Each structure stands twice: as C-alpha cells, then as structure tokens.
Amino acid sequence: GGGGRCGSCGGVGASTPITCDAVNGAAPTDDVAPASDNVPFEELAPHVETTFRQMEADCAANTKPAGLLDHVDTVSVARDLDVLRALSGNEKLDYLGASYGTYLGAYYAELFPANTGRMVLDGALDPSLSQYERRRGQAQGFEQALRNYVDWCQAGQDCPLTGGTDAGVQQIVDLIAAADQTPVASSDPNRPVTGQEIQTIVLLYLRLSEGSWTVLNTALNQAINQNDASTFRVLANETLSQSMVDVGVFYGNTCLDYRVEGDMTTWAAQSQELEKVAPHFGTLYEGGDLTCQSWGHSGTQPPKALHAKGAAPIL
C-alpha cells in the first residue's frame, strides 16, 4: 500500500497553504504562549479577541483561494489524504501518525475503513473530548512531565536543581520569571534570552525522551549557576523556527475541528480550574474557545468517539 506519515499536516507546505503575514507567522501556538504572569482571564480576553480577529483578517487576505479557511478541518484533510492515496495508485493507505497525525489517522479510518492499510497512531488524541478537555489534559501532561524531568535530573549527575521535586520545579519557574524581568545574557550580545524563550525550550524538551534531557541539564546549569543563557540561545535559534507551526495553520485547523462551547463566564471558570490542575502551565492553555470564536471559523459538530468499523486493526 501507499505510505504516509503525519505529525502536523494540513494547510502547510506544497499543498495549498494558509498564508499569513510574517509577523503573525511567528505568533504563539497552542503551547507556546507568553510566560504566565497570572493576569486574570477577564483582563486577558479583550487582548485575545483583538489579536485573533486581526490575525484572521490578515490570513484571509493572504490565503488563496478565498474561502480556504473554512475547509482545513481534519475531515477535509482526511479526504485529501484519500485523494493522494488514489492518485498514487495504492489500494490501501499505510500510515504512521503522531500528535495531531493520530487525530487525522483516526478520522481517515472512520471515513475510509476499506482503504485503511497498516496504521500506527503514536500517542493518540481522543476525538471524543471537547477542545477544553483536550487542552486541560495537555496542561496536566506537561505538569507531570516537568516533575518527571526534575526527578530524573536529581537522580543523575550534574543536575543544577537542588532539594526535592517541588524545590526543583520552583527553581525552573523562578528562572523563567527572572528572565522575563531581565533577559539572561547569551553568546550573542544583541540577543539575551527571555523567560518566554526558556519556557518554550523547556516545554519542547519535556516532549522528548530522557535521552534528550541532558541538553536541558546543560542549559539550566549555565543559566542558573553562571547566569549564562548561551545554550538556551542556541536551542531557541535551532528549534523555535522549526517547531512553531504557523499560527494561522494551527488555529485554522484546530478551530474548525471544534465547535465553540461556553461563554466568558464559563471560560473564566475554566481558567481558574486550569491554574489549579496545572499551576505552572495551565495559563498557556486557557481561552481556546474564545480564541476560536475570535478567529471566526469554527466547527459545528460536537466531539464524538470514532470506531473505524471495518478497518484493519490499528496500533
């Protein structure tokens, strides 16, 4: 059969892409947002609304054909995937999906079970969850991953984090907060490293296996003990441009996959819940429904479980 791999597909690259202004192209995605400064949701909301309305207008003006922003949901991407399968002359689609790619693979198997070949979904997203439930789960996952990293670090050599798990977590949080106030000097004299950049790198490395965590040890050791963020500077230069999916693509796809649920009162309560269940990362995940309402292109169907009846076994 034909092979496919997807980590974050749809609306990018040599397909017909969503195109946004370069300034907005570097705007924060789902989990790369300003470091938490505990601004109440009610104060943040008008800024979110203005930002995403402007961004949508910009993306709509730069994206051809007109109307594409209403057709980049996962169901549409799955249908495109089946067209690619047919054009390549394959009876079945063999597919490896990670992250968002698991969501796409699940929808493909639901829509085209007879065309589904060998499919592996690594770390599957649950399609029956609402956008808020998904974001809450992600925030909790990062919160646990941060604790796992600190435990791993303290059990090994050359760990800059002292005390127990809570103390180690707090040292990272304090570093981020301090760098937000006064960016930390790096090997590039014109580019000290901000708390937001440190937080983003920490989040990216928490997604990786323990084999990559020694790099985080090195970066934190320099920053905490030598007030030198050179390693963070290198990591930011290397990874941020690659990992920060164009925000227009991200929200263009995500918002069409979920209908907007709740109102300002609901979202303020959810914001408080997020800060309770994920005190260090919760604020990065608040306001998803408000964002999509402001973006102006959202789904209409409630989330549902997918069963892919008739498809070959999926791993």
Question: Where do the PLM segments sit?
Answer:
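Mobile, glycine-rich extracellular loop/lid and propeptide segments
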Residues: 1, 102, 123-124
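Loop/turn elements at helix/coil->beta-strand transitions in domains of secreted/extracellular proteins
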Residues: 2-5, 46, 53-54, 90-93, ...
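Cap/lid segment of the alpha/beta-hydrolase catalytic domain
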Residues: 2-75
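A catalytic-pocket lid/entrance helix-loop region that shapes and gates access to the active site
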Residues: 5, 13-37, 107-171, 205, ...
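Conserved acidic catalytic loop of the alpha/beta-hydrolase fold
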Residues: 64-67, 78-92
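Glycine-rich nucleophile elbow surrounding the catalytic serine of serine-hydrolase chemistry
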Residues: 79, 97-109
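Alpha/beta-hydrolase fold active-site neighborhood
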Residues: 167-311
